[in-house]
Amino acid sequence: MMTSSPPPNDLTTLQTLSEQELVKLDWQSLSCFSGELLELHAEGKLGNENFAKLPRKPILCIDQIELLDEHRIEATFQFPANQSEWPYDPAESLEMLFQDQLDQLVGFWGARKIKGIGRALSSGRCTLYQSLDFQPSKTLRFVLEKRKWMTSKEGGGTAVFNGKILDDADNLLLDTRNVIVGILNPTDIHDLRQRFGGKSGVAKPDVNEKISGLRIPVFDNDLGSVRSGDGKTISREATQSISPDLWPLRYHFRGDPVVPGNFGTHGMLALLKTSASEDFGLRNPVFKSMLKKSFSGMIFEDQKQIRFSLLNVVQNDEGDVVAKEARLFLENADGSKMIEDPIYTFKGLTVTEG
């Protein structure tokens, strides 16, 4: 029998409960979540073993959820005071890691309504206003407001939110419109695994492992640029090998390993930054914005490769470098396509001089 829930927004009470008490709570009825509750959810210990789970740290960068109700989500994360305690390389660009937290929060919201597995489907315009790189003790606030929730005849659902990342002085750091996450039937995910290479499984994280200096995977084979016949646009491709040893798969998600979609976005940005430097002369290209991204497939763990493809890359009047379109394809290890259509597409991916 479930115990009665603590009062809404009573993080103080939650933080006094033992693990044995926390696992007895009906997490789907709570309106706030301590860090320990989020970690238990990631491990499937809240009655969600066969359903949606949050990623484990270090992919999960949410310390607690202060508010989660029918219309709004508010959560926070604080960087550690010492760089040595931060698991990522301090020089790493992290805007896509933190945008991924918005997707995770929307999926978590939807999984309270339907017992399924959340997957990001798309998002609209995303704009970076200030750096999201490591800054000691800095606090980030994730604020999301619901636009709509739709259920399907098959039993799934789709949640749409607008999301922002703020600092503790309410300065806007990043905003994303129309974050869309679907809640899928677990059997559908199983079928996708069979079709797209998710049979190998991955090693469990070592609980005693000291994680440091992590880099988000980008690409391991830059195939270079091709200039159009009129010389006005550039296209560029690169590939990356996928195997069960790729580190993000150990943490995202337990029992359902998949490369985070926004890590693929990070790789596409890295290729655009390379083009901006080599093809257009930018000294320090950084992410500025994108108009839209869409996910129609997932990168599972079996040996394969992914292909990044930038199309119609130009420099605009402001000096920004823009990929009017970008696509990510799933390929077999020999370079033949697993499926003809791209599994990720991007519109208006833009970098600027940092």
What are these regions (language model features)?
Residues 2-92, 112, 133, 147-158, ...:
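Non-catalytic linker/capping segments at the edges of enzyme domains
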Residues 63, 163, 290-293, 325-327:
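Hydrophobic/aromatic beta-strand elements that line small-molecule binding cavities or substrate pockets
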Residues 65, 90-118, 258-283:
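Active-site helix/loop of acyl-thioester processing domains in fatty-acid/polyketide metabolism
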Residues 113, 119-132, 137-150, 164-166, ...:
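4′-phosphopantetheine-dependent carrier domains
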Residues 142, 159-179:
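Hydrophobic, ordered structural segments
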Residues 169-171, 332-336:
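Solvent-exposed strand-loop boundary residues in beta-sheet-rich modules
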